[in-house]
């Protein structure tokens, strides 16, 4: 699916190009480049590289109102080339400070950016 092949960008121009053979929609490429880490130690930086962000399965918890993203090694392989860190094959609570609320989600599916063993950015399916 084309949307699953489109990935987000994080910090360095060296990571701004997609892996070989992955088609890029120019409009979506610009959208991903516009996403910034909303808060925390990486605030203001680009959310992700093409290797770090994916559409993910998400659930909400009625008790705490938080999002949980399923982070698995099939979606985020740790082959050493992108610095994903270990994918726990588990539901991971999305920290409130990494949720992007200021723009719509053009993919229509939840996006999580998993980098160095943590979620750096998250865009809900509905966006704002």
Model-derived regions: residue spans:
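N-terminal secretory signal peptides
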Residues: 17-70
């Amino acid at each position: 699916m084309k949307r699953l092949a489109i990935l987000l960008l994080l910090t360095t121009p060296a990571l701004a190009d997609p892996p070989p053979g992955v088609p890029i929609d120019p409009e979506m490429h610009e959208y991903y480049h516009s996403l910034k880490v909303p808060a925390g130690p990486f605030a203001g930086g680009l959310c992700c590289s093409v290797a770090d962000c994916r559409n993910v399965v998400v659930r909400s918890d009625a008790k705490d109102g938080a999002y949980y993203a399923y982070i698995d090694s099939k979606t985020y392989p740790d082959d050493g080339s992108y610095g994903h860190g270990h994918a726990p094959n588990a539901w991971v609570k999305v920290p409130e400070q990494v949720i992007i609320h200021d723009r719509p989600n053009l993919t229509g599916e939840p996006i999580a950016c998993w980098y160095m063993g943590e979620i750096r950015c998250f865009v809900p399916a509905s966006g704002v």
